[in-house]
């Protein structure tokens, strides 16, 4: 299955229309410092262990700090059969889109 890149403005639509599970693939400390509402902390290094808990019929939306780690996660998850969306620019872009610097 393929993965798709989206911009922060498209996140709500994917979450609502696809009932996507939102995964923050940054380190736990970064997650604790702030994350997208409703996102689960799923550090990239632990993604193999987490995959068995995800329903393959559920759409996943992943993000990291800048967008590069979430691309790796999206690639890995899509190879395992998940429909995955990743946010271009990561949490930095999400913050800018929502008016935070």
Which residues make up each language-model segment?
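Rhodanese-like catalytic fold shared by cysteine-dependent sulfurtransferases
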Residues: 1-21, 28-59, 68-101
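Short, surface-exposed ligand- or partner-binding patches at beta-edge/loop junctions that are enriched
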Residues: 63-64
């Amino acid at each position: 299955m393929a993965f798709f890149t989206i911009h922060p403005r498209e996140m709500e639509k994917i979450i609502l229309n696809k009932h996507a599970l939102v995964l923050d693939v940054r380190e736990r400390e970064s997650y604790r410092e702030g994350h997208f509402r409703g996102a689960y902390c799923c550090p990239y290094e632990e993604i193999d262990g987490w995959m068995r808990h995800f329903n393959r019929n559920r759409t996943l939306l992943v993000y990291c700090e800048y967008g590069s780690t979430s691309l790796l996660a999206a690639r890995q998850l899509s190879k395992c059969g998940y429909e995955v969306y990743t946010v271009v620019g990561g949490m930095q872009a999400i913050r800018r889109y929502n008016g935070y610097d």
